A protein has these predicted regions:
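Juxtamembrane extramembrane loops of integral membrane proteins
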Residues: 21-37
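Intracellular loop-helix junctions on the cytosolic face of multi-pass helical membrane proteins
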Residues: 2, 29, 33, 56-61, ...
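Intracellular juxtamembrane helix-capping segments at the cytosolic ends
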Residues: 18-19, 111-128
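Glycine-rich segments within core transmembrane alpha-helices of 12-TM secondary carriers
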Residues: 32-48, 133-158
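Transmembrane-helix boundary and interhelical linker motifs in polytopic inner-membrane proteins
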Residues: 43-63, 127-132
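Pair of pore-lining "gating" transmembrane helices in MFS-fold secondary transporters
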Residues: 1-24, 102-110, 212
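Central hydrophobic cores of alpha-helical transmembrane segments in multi-pass inner-membrane proteins
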Residues: 9, 16, 35-53, 116-121
Length: 212
């Protein structure tokens, strides 16, 4: 769990540190308040879709879906940022008509909100109270290494390149799906027991609601 959260935090901190410079270069930093409002509204819509999907997919499949979607999105953004005609090296003046800056900003905000919530939902579904009390502090502590790694990479954006860092962020997101898959293979028996307990609890709640 700590490795999983570290990867999520590393990717988020890496790209979150770059979203303002990208917005400033492509759209204009004066449009940041508007970008924040758009991000909030978009996150609300995506959260509604996420709530629907939680009843249709398992937590693991949700991780795979979210990782693939955001990973592909950030790979595309990375390629577009490297484009000499419309990317960061374009001779065009910043302006609100350049959609790439908006999309990059909103995508980063949505990823941070959705992926962290999904992680804690997944963790709570496979840990009992005793395990949680002993592990949560350790998980959060180890996850700080991800934050340090992501923000450290971002400070070297001039030498590495922002488009390359977005690609690194996309790869870290894809690795989240891989770690979840490995976790399910290694701890398959424990997960089955946890999901069975959740299903039993859900059925009991429905029966109690019918009785009342």
């Amino acid at each position: 769990h700590a490795v999983l959260l570290s990867l999520i935090i590393a990717g988020f901190w890496l790209m979150d540190s770059l979203k303002d410079p990208v917005l400033a270069r492509i759209v204009g930093i004066e449009y940041q308040p508007i970008a924040k409002v758009i991000s909030v509204l978009t996150t609300l819509v995506i959260t509604c879709v996420y709530d629907f999907l939680t009843s249709q997919l398992s937590k693991a499949n949700l991780f795979h879906l979210v990782s693939v979607v955001f990973g592909v999105v950030f790979m595309i953004i990375s390629a577009l940022l490297a484009d000499p005609d419309g990317g960061l090296r374009s001779s065009d003046a910043p302006g609100p008509h350049r959609l790439l800056g908006w999309v990059a900003y909103v995508s980063i905000e949505c990823y941070g909100s959705l992926m962290v919530a999904l992680f804690w939902s997944f963790t709570n579904s496979v840990m009992n109270l005793e395990e949680a009390m002993g592990a949560y502090g350790l998980i959060i502590s180890i996850a700080q290494f991800g934050a340090i790694a992501g923000s450290t990479l971002a400070t070297n954006s001039k030498s590495i390149g922002i488009s390359v860092l977005f690609l690194a962020g996309a790869l870290s997101i894809f690795s989240v799906s891989l770690v979840v898959k490995v976790y399910h293979v290694v701890f398959r028996r424990k997960l089955r027991s946890a999901y069975a307990a959740l299903q039993t609890e859900s059925e009991f709640s429905r029966e109690r609601e019918r009785a009342t």
